[in-house]
């Protein structure tokens, strides 16, 4: 068949249309595929962007430098008191060994001030003069040495050799060890051995161990001393193999502030994370600020005036009574501590079974004037100040910043004395020098009389004639006899009565003016947890301390 030109053109048109249809279908399919691919790419791109954003957020919450990472793992605590060393056998420095989490004792006081096992598992009394202590088997010192009976024996022997206060309290005749047990034999019956082994001077140390600083011992606590600089502060690092579990933070910095007013500014500027010793005048503002947390406990720490019996005026009973009568305990506690303190009747708080029920103290300015007049202290030359035997009466008052409220109390007393015609001059001293001072009338002093739940150690040290803590040289033969009786008394009711009798004698003699009991408070940034106050006032840093 012969094809015509029209046939050829018709087929060409059909083929062309078919080709265009195929091409169009391909393009449509291609475009659809591209749309799907674009959707996939958009989804992938969106996911990637979200991931990057999340990574960016996560990164901003993490320390951006080694310095910031270190800071996140460091808790800095400011204190207004810092000893020259933390050897537990040196004076009262064991308080800081325990407070900083460096050292631990065989027993530990709970919140009810009852001794509980700590480094010890249990204690038994085979006879009246013997105590057998079984030790934990999983404790190591911060140099890796295991805590054995022999190590504990050496530590306790070192203690009674170096500390007269501890030796007098414990009355140890001999110490023997066997494996994980230690047997203590006493010279006389010792009814409160568990309590005394919870006293911070009883911190167990490795006598043969060498710490990074000669100012600190090798203890068993969660933190070990790396740097210790008197009058500045200390650096503590977590002990990797602490028996209670490694600490949650890597480092603790202790920073000393000689000026209590500066410690508040340091907390606000984040120079420190927490403070102990904040002026009570500043405490109220922190309670209202959600950026901070406060751990506050009713404690047994009191503020007092200790009268120096070496001073000839103070040695006069009526003059000393006049000094006591001029102290307005109610106003002092309300104005100085801003509601965080209560007036005291004696050295033990009313919550204690041992507390004195009633004091002979009374605030009475007119009575003070009358006492001075009767004792021959009179203003004979009209200058506004009293004389005795023709000589103007001038006394010296010590002042120091152990508490920011102390200087304020002394200044108030100076003014009160002036109003009754006694010239008083204030001399500022370091708290560490107070015990060695001899030329003064009275000094403020802050004490916890029964940090181990029983007041015997306090009476034996601070009240008994010649006691190592009796800085005012108070002496009463009857009180001494009762303290000696208290040392061996096993009946709790009789211990309570003896303690009240001793306080009544102190009170009657006006040997001390116990002004009031104040709460112990730690103020911290809200990021800090597990930094708690305790009624004893010496358990602060633990392995649970954390920082968010």
Task: Name each model-derived stretch.
Residues 78-126, 218, 536-537:
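N-terminal lobe/hinge region of extracytoplasmic solute-binding protein
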Residues 121-163:
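Aromatic- and charge-enriched surface segment that lines or borders ligand/interaction sites
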Residues 326-355, 405-412, 435-548:
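Detector for C-terminal structural segments
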Residues 379-450:
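Ligand/substrate-recognition segments at binding pockets and active sites
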């Amino acid at each position: 068949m012969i094809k015509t030109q029209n046939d050829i053109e018709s087929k060409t048109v059909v083929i062309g249309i078919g080709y265009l249809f195929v091409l169009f279908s391909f393009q449509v399919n291609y475009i659809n595929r591209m749309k799907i691919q674009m959707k996939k790419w958009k989804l992938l791109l969106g996911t990637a962007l979200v991931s990057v954003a999340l990574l960016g957020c996560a990164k901003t919450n993490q320390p951006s430098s080694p310095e910031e990472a270190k800071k996140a793992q460091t808790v800095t605590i400011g204190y207004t008191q810092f000893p020259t060393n933390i050897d537990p056998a040196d004076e009262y420095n064991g308080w800081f060994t325990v407070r900083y989490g460096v050292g631990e004792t065989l027993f530990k006081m709970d919140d009810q001030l009852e001794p509980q096992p700590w480094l010890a598992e249990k204690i038994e009394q085979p006879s009246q003069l013997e105590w057998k202590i079984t030790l934990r088997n999983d404790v190591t010192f911060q140099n890796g040495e295991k805590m054995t009976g022999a190590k504990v024996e050496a530590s306790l022997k070192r203690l009674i050799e170096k500390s007269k206060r501890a030796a007098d309290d414990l009355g140890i005749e001999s110490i023997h060890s066997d494996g994980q047990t230690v047997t203590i034999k006493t010279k006389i019956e010792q009814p409160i051995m568990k309590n005394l082994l919870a006293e911070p001077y009883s911190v167990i140390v490795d006598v043969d161990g060498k710490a990074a600083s000669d100012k600190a011992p090798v203890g068993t606590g969660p933190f070990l001393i790396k740097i210790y600089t008197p009058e500045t502060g200390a650096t503590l690092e977590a002990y990797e193999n602490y028996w209670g579990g490694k600490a949650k933070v890597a480092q603790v910095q202790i920073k000393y502030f000689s000026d209590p007013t500066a410690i508040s500014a340091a907390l606000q500027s984040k120079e420190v994370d927490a403070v102990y010793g904040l002026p009570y005048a500043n405490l109220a503002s922190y309670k209202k600020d959600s950026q901070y947390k406060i751990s506050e406990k009713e404690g047994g720490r009191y503020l007092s005036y200790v009268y120096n019996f070496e001073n000839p005026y103070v040695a006069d009973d009526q003059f000393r009574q006049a000094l006591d009568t001029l102290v307005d305990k109610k106003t002092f506690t309300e104005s100085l501590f801003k509601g965080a303190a209560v007036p005291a009747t004696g050295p033990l708080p009313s919550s204690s079974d041992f507390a004195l029920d009633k004091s002979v103290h009374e605030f009475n300015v007119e009575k003070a004037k009358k006492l001075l007049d009767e004792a021959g202290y009179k203003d004979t030359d009209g200058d506004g100040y009293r004389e005795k035997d023709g000589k103007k009466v001038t006394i010296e008052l010590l002042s120091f910043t152990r508490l920011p409220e102390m200087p304020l109390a002394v200044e108030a007393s100076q003014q009160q004395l002036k109003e009754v015609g006694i010239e008083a001059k204030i001399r500022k001293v370091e708290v560490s020098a107070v015990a060695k001072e001899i030329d003064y009338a009275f000094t403020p002093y802050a004490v916890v009389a029964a940090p181990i739940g029983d007041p015997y150690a306090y009476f034996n040290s601070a009240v008994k004639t010649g006691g190592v803590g009796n800085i005012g040289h108070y002496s009463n033969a009857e009180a001494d006899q009762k303290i000696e009786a208290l040392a061996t008394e096993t009946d709790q009711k009789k211990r309570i009565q003896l303690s009240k009798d001793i306080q009544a004698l102190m009170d009657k003699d006006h040997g001390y003016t116990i002004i009031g009991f104040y709460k112990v408070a730690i103020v911290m940034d809200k990021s800090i947890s597990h930094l708690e106050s305790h009624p004893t006032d010496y358990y602060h840093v633990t392995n649970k301390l954390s920082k968010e």
